[in-house]
């Protein structure tokens, strides 16, 4: 017996290329073999002339906002990330896609002469974070951050027994009244260290950024040239730039002194 949930139906139009870019980023977050069906889905929210796309694997949350879309009816749903990505990929560039939440379990996509029906799951089941990250914020240039990540990620360890080496150690240090954001990684055979000079002192607790987060962040930064807002609280970190937000859990452990 199918359970129905009552939610305002949703109807909107969106540019294919913007949606494809957003869904493409989501592919790196979604776990292909998740035991929870909802984690194979993307959350789609149409509200205030914007479309918000969210993907998570519980350790990593990625959100992208597509602004200035035509919304006939606001609403939200979740649908398979892999299937919607595959469909949008095959739709010609420059097209407009119409979305219509026909009922609580069916999202209809229409573009040119093609029509597709996607299965949906209740958006209220989608796990979201509600932490307040408004402390310890600082800005850093995206190109500089990508540079230090690329210089250090080659030394990340794959040894699962030493989880504290399965990422990049990020910390702020001071030298001759100058402050640097320093990245370090080691697999115990080799070590890579790179640093960025900061404009002023920042409050930033030392963290170990997980490997998956690093790969996702690298792909997001590749086509960016702007300031990124970084803030961390307890066991999580948030990167905010343009219309994208990446929130990640951190590796719990102590990076070796070097």
Provide a role label for each language-model segment.
Residues 2-258:
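Structural preference for solvent-exposed beta-strand-turn elements
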């Amino acid at each position: 017996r199918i359970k129905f949930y009552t939610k305002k139906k949703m109807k909107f139009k969106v540019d294919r290329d913007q949606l494809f870019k957003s869904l493409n980023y989501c592919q790196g977050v979604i776990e292909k073999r998740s035991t929870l069906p909802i984690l194979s889905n993307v959350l789609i929210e149409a509200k205030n002339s914007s479309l918000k796309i969210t993907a998570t694997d519980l350790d990593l949350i990625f959100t992208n906002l597509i602004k200035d879309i035509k919304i006939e009816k606001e609403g939200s749903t979740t649908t398979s990330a892999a299937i919607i990505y595959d469909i949008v990929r095959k739709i010609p560039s420059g097209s407009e896609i119409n979305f219509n939440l026909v009922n609580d379990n069916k999202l209809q996509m229409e573009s040119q002469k093609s029509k597709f029906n996607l299965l949906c799951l209740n958006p209220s089941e989608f796990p979201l974070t509600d932490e307040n990250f408004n402390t310890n914020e600082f800005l850093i240039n995206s190109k500089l951050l990508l540079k230090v990540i690329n210089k250090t990620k080659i030394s990340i360890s794959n040894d699962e027994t030493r989880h504290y080496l399965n990422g990049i150690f990020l910390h702020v240090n001071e030298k001759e009244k100058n402050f640097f954001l320093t990245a370090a990684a080691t697999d115990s055979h080799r070590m890579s260290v790179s640093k960025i000079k900061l404009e002023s002192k920042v409050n930033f607790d030392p963290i170990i950024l997980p490997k998956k987060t690093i790969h996702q962040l690298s792909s997001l930064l590749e086509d960016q040239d702007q300031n990124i807002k970084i803030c961390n609280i307890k066991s999580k970190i948030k990167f905010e730039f343009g219309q994208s937000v990446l929130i990640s859990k951190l590796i719990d452990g102590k990076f070796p002194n070097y």
